[in-house]
Amino acid sequence: MRTKTLLLTAALAAAGAATSMAQVYSVNMVGYINQNIPRGFSMLANQLNNSPDNKVTTLFAAPPDGTQVYKFDAVTDTYVFLQYIDGNWEGDDLNMTLGPGEGVFINPPSAFATTFVGEVQLSSSVGVANGFSIVSSALPQSLPLSDAPPAGLGFPVANGDQVYQFSNATGTYTFNQFVDGAWEGDGGGSPPVPAVGEAFFVNNGGASKNWNRTFTVGP
């Protein structure tokens, strides 16, 4: 999977010379992510705010015929299902979204490439429910999950939190748990490092919480 997140546009509002940095009132970061999706099950994230929306049917207008998408519902502990058949999406919820911070299982019958295009979320808040949920970083970064930004993703880890990362190649999960102030598990004591475009399971044993991020642009 190749990732290219670029500053493509800067919206400038100024009175006077538009090139003066002191006169920038707002900046929009627009980027793109080239995502190679393998055959079979994988956990996928879209880390850009797409226009006109982040519906699965918009993001994947014409995937391989037979492609399936499963989105986990943390409230009901069940999956919402969509499938692309004969040029159309059908299933439980045609309004299913895959926005920054969310995640799904995708199961195409053959590998394909797609490009996500949209705005980078300069400020984000991802809800992490009690129990199992599928989440992702709202920013397209591959960094240690619980380390503080800018060196890490700033996940609000708590004692007992579990993280499961699915491998398309092996069909198994990598497991790590935060216990008594340290990570233990398959990562050998290091925090999980999700890839750009990767979603993962979190098992939060405590109350619901928010994973907040602020990304600063400029000098």
Task: Give residue spans per PLM region.
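N-terminal exported-region signature
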Residues: 19-219
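Sec-dependent, cleavable N-terminal signal peptides
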Residues: 1-23
